[in-house]
C-alpha cells in the first residue's frame, strides 16, 4: 500500500492506518492459529487431505478479504489526501477535509466492523467444521472395525452357503431317485391294476359260466328225472303188455298149460319167454342196424354227389350277392343323380320362367317406348309443320327483299353500265339465261315437294297398317303434306317471279352455290343484315333460286329431266345426267317396293324433321326435298343426306355431334350432316349437272372463283351452324336408335348420290381424267366415291371414312367441284375439327385456294358475332385475290365475274374489320 506524506502527517490518518494494520495482523493471525490448532490424526490419507483442504480454504478467504479492505482503505486515504491538497484555502480546505475524513472514517469503521463480524462468523464455522472432521475420523475408525467383523461373518455365511448348496444338490439327487422310484412303482401299480382288472373280468366270466353250468345241470337233472320217469312208465307199460301177452298165451294154451302146469313150473316158462323175446329183440336190433347202415351209406353217397352241386350253388349265391350289392350301390348312385337332375331341371324351369317374365316385361316396356316414340314423332311432325309455315313466311319476306334488291341492283347496273361498257354488255345475256333456267327449275320445285309429301304419306300408311298409333301419324303427315304443298307452291311462285334478275348475275355460279344454297340463304341473309351490303344478299337469293331449281329438277318426272338436259346440252355431260336420273327413278321404284324398310326410315325422317324445323334457317326443307333424288328414301328426301353414304355417320350422329351439329346449323331443316351432304351431292344430278356443264364451258378456273366467292358466306354459315349444334345433338341422341334402322336404305341413297357425283365429276373432269377415275372408285368403295377432283381428295376421304366422317368429305368435294370449296371447309370443321384446306388447295390447283381454307378458325368461332365473321372474311379476302386473277381471263363470261367483284369488295370490308 502506498501512503502519501500528508496522510502520514495527519494524526487521524495515521491512527486509521495503524488500526488497519492491527486489524490485518489479527485477521492474518486468526487463520494461522486456526490452522495450527487443527488436530492431526493418523487416519486414512483421504480423510487427512480432505481436512487439510477445508482448513486451508478458510484462512485464504479471510486473508483475501483483509487485503481487499486494506486496499480500499488506502484508496480512501489517497483520495482524502488529494482532497486536502487540492483545497483552495487553508481554512476552508481543512474544514472540508475534516468533514470528508469523518465521513470516510465512519464508513470505514462500519465496514471494518462488518469485516470483523464476518471473521468471527467464519471462525465459528471453522470450529464446527473441525468438530465434524473429528467425528468423521472417529466414525471411520469404528467403520474399519465393523468391516473386519462383517468380513468374518461374510466368510462364515459363504461357507454355510456352500454347505447348503451341497446339501441342496444331494437332496435334489435324492429327489430325482425318488421320482424314478415313484415312476417305477406307478408303472407296477398300473400293471397290477390291469392284472387285477383282467382277473376280475375272468372271474366274472367264470361266474357266468358257473351260473350257466348250474342252469344246464338243473335242466339235465330235470331231463334225467323225466327220462327216469319215462323209463319207469315204459317199464310199467311193458310189464303190462307182457302180462297181457302172457295172459293171452296162457289163454291160448290153457289146456296145454294146464297140462304143463301139471308137469312144469312157471319159472321155466318165463325163462323160455324171455329167451324168445330176447332173440326177437336181437333180431330186430340187427335188422334196424342193417337198415340204418344201408340208409346211411345211401345218404352219404347222395351227399357226396351233391357236394359239388352245393359248392357251385354256394359260389353262385355268393356271386349273386356281390352283384346284388354292386347293383344296389349303382341304384343308389343313379337315384342320387336322378334327384340332382330333377333339382337342376326345376331350377332351370324356374329360371326359364323368370327370364320369360323378364323378357315379357322388357317387350312390354319396348312397346310402350315405341308408342311414346311414335307420339313424339307425331309431335315433331306437327312442330315441323309449324316451322315450315314460319319458313314459308320468311321465304315470302326474303322474296320481297329480293325484289327490292333486284330493283336497286338493276338501277345500279344501269348506272355502272353507262360508265363501264364491257360490264354492262355482259349483264343482259346473263339475265336471259337466268330467265330461261329459273322457270324450268321452279316448276319442278312444286313437283318435288309433292313427291316428298306423297312418300311420307305412303310410308306412314304402311305404319298405320301395323299399329293404330301409326295411323294417327299418317293422318298428321297427310295434313302436313297438304299444308306443305300449299305453302311451298306459294313460295315457289314467289321465288319464280323474284330470282330472274338474280340469275342474270348468278347463272354461271349456280353449280358452286347449289349445295350451299339453303345454308347461304339463311346465313348470308344474316351477313347482309350485319354488313348491310346488298351485294351479298343478291348472292344469297341467287343461291336460293339455284337450290330451288336443283330440288325441282331432281324430283320432276323424266320430262322435266329432259328439259334440264336440253339446258345442259351446252355441256358435254347431258347423257350422263340422263343416266343419273334414270338410276334415281329405278331407285325410287325399288324403295317403293321396300315399304318395311321405308317405314323405319320414315320414323327416322320424322324424328329428323323436327330437328330441321328447329334449326333457324327454314330454307333447307324445300331445298332438301327438291334436292333429294325423289323417293329414294324418306331419309334422302328429308335429309338429302349423303349421310347414307356411310351408315357410320348416321349412327355417329349422336356420339359424334361435331358433324351433325355444324351441318344442322348450316341448314335449319337439315337433320344433321344429312342435309348438307344431300344438298351438295343429290341436287347435282339434274340441275347441278346443267350448271356444272355451264361452268365446265367457262372452265375450272371459274368454278374455283365461284367457290372462293362462296367461301365467305359459307364460313359465316359455319358460325351459325356451330351455335345451332348445341341444341341439335341432344335431339339426335334420342333419335339415334331409329336412325340406325334406316341404314339399309341409306346405302341405296348413297348409290344414287354417287351417280350424281359421277355425273358432275365427269362434266368437270373431262379436262381432268384423274378426278373421274377417283370418283368411280369412290362409287365402288363407299367412302372414296365423292372425293374425286384430285388424288389428295381420295386419300382424304379414306382417312375420314375411318372416323365416320366420309359423308362430310363427300359433300365437301362435290360442293367444291360445282359449288365451291366453301362446303368442304364447313364440313371439315364439323367432322374433324381440322382444316380441310389441303383438299381445297388440291382442288384449287394453281389458283391458291390454300390460303382461303382455314377450318380450325371456323371451329373456334361458336358465336355469330363479329369475331367469327371476321375470320370468315379473311378467307373471303384470299378468295377475292384469286377471283381477281381470273377476272381478267373470264370477264366475257356471265355475271360470275361481276359477282366476284362484289365479293371482293365485301371481303375487303371484312378484312378491315379484322385488322380493327
From Swiss-Prot:
Positions of modified residues (Phosphothreonine): 571
Organism: Homo sapiens
Location of the region described as Coil 2A in the Swiss-Prot/TrEMBL record: 266-287
Listed name of the protein: Neurofilament medium polypeptide
IF rod domain segment(s): 101-412
Start and end residues of each stretch annotated as Tail: 413-916
GO cellular component: axon; intermediate filament; intermediate filament cytoskeleton; neurofibrillary tangle; neurofilament; postsynaptic intermediate filament cytoskeleton
Transmembrane segments: none
Renumbered residue ranges of the record's region Coil 1A: 105-136
Family: Belongs to the intermediate filament family.
Described function: Neurofilaments usually contain three intermediate filament proteins: NEFL, NEFM, and NEFH which are involved in the maintenance of neuronal caliber. May additionally cooperate with the neuronal intermediate filament proteins PRPH and INA to form neuronal filamentous networks.
Listed Polar residues bias regions: 1-10
Low complexity bias (residue ranges): 21-44
Gene: NEFM
Positions with biased composition (Basic and acidic residues): 542-561, 583-614, 686-701, 707-742, 755-778, 788-828, 839-851
Pfam families the UniProt entry points to: Filament, Filament_head
Sequence repeat spans: 614-626, 627-639, 640-652, 653-665, 666-678, 679-691
Region (Linker 2): 288-291
Entry annotated with the keyword Amino-acid biosynthesis: no
Post-translational modifications: There are a number of repeats of the tripeptide K-S-P, NFM is phosphorylated on a number of the serines in this motif. It is thought that phosphorylation of NFM results in the formation of interfilament cross bridges that are important in the maintenance of axonal caliber.
Residues where N-acetylserine is found: 2
Alphabetically ordered keywords of this record: Acetylation, Cell projection, Coiled coil, Cytoplasm, Cytoskeleton, Glycoprotein, Intermediate filament, Methylation, Phosphoprotein, Repeat
Region of interest (Coil 2B), residue spans: 292-412
Location of region: Linker 12: 249-265
